[in-house]
Design a protein with these regions (language model features):
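N-terminal organellar transit peptides
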Residues: 1-68, 72-76, 83-96, 101-229
Length: 229
């Protein structure tokens, strides 16, 4: 049975709340089964190295990988999409490619190192685009320099996708995917808030310790009168 994986959210090396797509989480889901897979992508991108790891996993997967873009595959997410045996895009989805970015501090030597590093990262990204599209490296470099946004038809025209998704006929008795991987930041936040709220809802029981301690005012007056007499 073909499996379906959902790659939704920002791509990162690590995740505090499992709300990002990480290579480790993706690998765990990818390796739990066998056979052909469909990967739905809706991601704004993220870490280039993490995306490269996921790309390599899909390229090395021994069965067919159908990538379907149902929202956006931008930046690093577009690199992952290139690993598909077939890439399909929704009529209302978008793809975006651009130059890699980083933050650097230091003197001119450090800045030059950062520039050279970005150049190498760009070359590695172009490798993935070139394999899929067949476009020249110069053309791909120009598209990245311009931060190119592509609708479904443009993505197919340039070779980043193979076809536009058509309306699928889904049988009523169709079973849910054998394995699904959904990273939803909203779901994680809501779950965390529910747990916090539950821990705050306490119903303290009344015990004898909760009763006021000490002597009454009347008893104090009686002792005071005795002292006066």
């Amino acid at each position: 049975m073909e499996r379906t994986l959902f790659l939704n959210g920002t791509i990162a090396e690590e995740s505090w709340f499992d709300d990002d797509v990480t290579p480790q989480l993706f690998k765990e889901e990818l390796m739990v089964g066998d056979g052909d897979i469909t990967v739905w992508i809706n991601s704004p991108g993220g870490d280039c190295v993490a995306a490269a790891q996921i790309y390599n996993m899909l390229m090395d997967y021994p069965h067919n990988v159908t990538v379907k873009i149902d929202g956006i595959a931008a930046s690093a997410a577009s690199v992952i999409a290139m690993a598909g045996t077939k890439v399909l895009v929704s009529p209302v989805s978008m793809m975006m490619i651009h130059n890699p970015m980083t933050v650097a501090m230091g003197d001119t030597a450090e800045m030059q190192k950062a520039i050279e590093m970005l150049g190498s990262v760009k070359d590695s990204i172009i490798n993935a685009y070139e394999i899929k599209t067949g476009l020249s490296r110069a053309k791909l470099s120009h598209l990245m320099d311009a931060e190119t946004w592509m609708d479904a038809n443009k993505a197919v025209e340039l070779g980043f996708a193979d076809d536009v998704l058509a309306r699928a006929e889904i049988p009523e008795d169709m079973e849910p995917p054998a394995v699904s991987m959904l990273y939803s930041k909203a779901a994680v936040v809501n779950s965390l808030m529910d747990k916090i709220a539950a821990s705050c809802r306490t119903n303290p029981k009344k015990t004898e310790d909760s009763k006021p301690k000490g002597r009454s005012v009347d008893s104090l007056y009686e002792r005071l009168n005795l002292l006066k007499n």
